[in-house]
């Protein structure tokens, strides 16, 4: 740090972008430099006058030294955008909502209340574009009503060979990457794989066809297996995640020759980010994944067998109303088995044994079907309305027959329309 000259200037210089101020030095300057010329710069009409102007949002420092190396001026330059212009732009883009913006030496602060998360996101993006890349923004805008989204997910493994045997076709009209997305039209049913009738297509459900009921029926016939049924609730705009599985160790060879252990996750995982839009529409970024340990591709590390991981995942963004469903499918796994049938003892005779044995290849295909249903929910204000499934059950075992006959309780039932509590 250079030694300060007599009557040196040490101050904070506040500038707006594309505007400047004049600084008069107490003595002629021999050297002038700016720490970050991309934020602010200068022009010197004379050796005692500096014109400092802002270029973009940020903070930097300006130093002016005399011929002896002593500091004539040490300025902390803070460059901001005209806050009145930003406030006017916010009103034009998001409407007349109580959203406030203020500047700090390090960035901008957004505060106030918005009707939904979409307005919050627009206000943040407008501020970022106005201030420029890299400008720190603190978002303190609150969403009115504390909207939350409950995501009901069913992850099922469906046997494709069983579906073909029953003449069921789970098809879709559109394919994106390795998974398919379609629409369940009103009146559509389960058609054959080759027929031209209605099919249970992978996509949105408009209450005419319940894919969940189809999965239940297939599970009873051992054609489908439900792997997980997570229910997650998250604030609008926040991230929620779920994992049903475990972790397995992986030996990792270090540079010094020693071996450390890292753990990798496997199983059924889900991550989603819901955003509540206008008219109760929900924008969902959902990333389901199913992974399992596999001997195919396994390796040996220092004599330790490390299994491979077979992974099927999808990543998509959709918009739908509360209570509607969509399905992700097309994630297929294939297994090929070679079955050998032979007559006892005779099948082992050289050359002639081939006449007494036969081999057949069996190809098994299974499809991963992920059913997702979002609901807009709010916290319950009355805890007495919340109950567990066993709250209305009365024990019958361990009581005398007469007392058992006297037990009376109301049959369990759901509360509210469709099982939801309406306040």
From Swiss-Prot:
Give the protein family: Belongs to the bacterial secretin family.
Write out the function statement from the record. Answer: Involved in the secretion of an unknown compound.
What are the boundaries of the signal sequence?
Answer: none
Full protein name: Uncharacterized protein y4xJ
| Top-rank lineage group of the source organism | Bacteria
Gene Ontology CC annotations of this record = type II protein secretion system complex
Q: Where is the BON domain?
A: 75-145
Which keywords does this Swiss-Prot/TrEMBL entry list?
Plasmid, Transport
One of its Pfam families is: Secretin
An annotated GO BP: protein secretion
Organism expressing this protein natively: Sinorhizobium fredii (strain NBRC 101917 / NGR234)
């Amino acid at each position: 740090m250079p030694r300060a000259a007599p009557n040196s200037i040490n101050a904070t210089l506040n500038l707006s972008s594309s505007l400047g101020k004049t600084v008069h030095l107490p003595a002629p300057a021999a050297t002038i430099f700016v720490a970050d010329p991309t934020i602010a710069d200068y022009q010197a009409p004379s050796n005692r006058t500096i014109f400092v102007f802002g270029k973009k949002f940020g903070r930097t420092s300006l130093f002016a030294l005399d011929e002896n190396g002593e500091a004539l001026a040490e300025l902390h330059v803070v460059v901001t955008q005209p806050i009145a212009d930003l406030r006017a732009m916010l009103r034009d883009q998001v409407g007349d909502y109580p959203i406030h913006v203020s500047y700090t030496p390090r960035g901008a602060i957004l505060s106030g209340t918005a009707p939904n998360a979409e307005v919050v996101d627009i206000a943040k993006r407008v501020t970022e574009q106005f201030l420029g890349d890299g400008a720190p923004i603190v978002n303190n805008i609150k969403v009115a009503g504390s909207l939350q989204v409950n995501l009901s997910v069913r992850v099922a493994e469906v046997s494709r060979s069983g579906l073909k045997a029953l003449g069921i076709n789970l098809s879709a009209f559109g394919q994106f990457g390795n998974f398919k997305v379609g629409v369940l039209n009103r009146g559509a049913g389960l058609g054959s794989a080759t027929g031209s009738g209605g099919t249970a297509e992978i996509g949105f459900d408009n209450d005419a066809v319940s894919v969940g009921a189809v999965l239940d029926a297939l599970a009873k016939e051992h054609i489908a297996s439900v792997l997980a049924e997570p229910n997650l609730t998250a604030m609008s705009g926040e991230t929620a995640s779920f994992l049903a599985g475990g972790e397995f160790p992986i030996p990792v060879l270090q540079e010094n020759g020693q071996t450390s252990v890292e753990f990798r996750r496997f199983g059924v995982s889900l991550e989603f980010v819901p955003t509540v839009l206008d008219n109760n529409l929900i924008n969902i970024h959902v990333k389901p994944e199913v992974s399992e340990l596999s001997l195919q591709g396994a390796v040996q590390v220092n004599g330790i067998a490390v299994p491979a991981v077979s992974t099927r995942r999808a990543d998509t963004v959709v918009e739908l109303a509360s209570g509607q469903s969509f399905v992700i499918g097309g994630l297929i796994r294939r297994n090929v088995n070679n079955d050998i049938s032979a007559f006892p003892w005779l099948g082992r005779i050289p050359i002639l044994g081939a006449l007494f044995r036969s081999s057949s290849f069996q190809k098994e295909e299974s499809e991963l079907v992920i059913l997702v249903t979002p609901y807009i929910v709010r916290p319950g204000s009355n805890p007495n309305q919340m109950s567990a499934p066993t709250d209305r059950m009365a024990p019958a075992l361990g009581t005398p027959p007469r007392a058992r006959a006297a037990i009376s309780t109301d049959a369990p039932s759901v509360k509210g329309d469709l099982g939801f509590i309406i306040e």
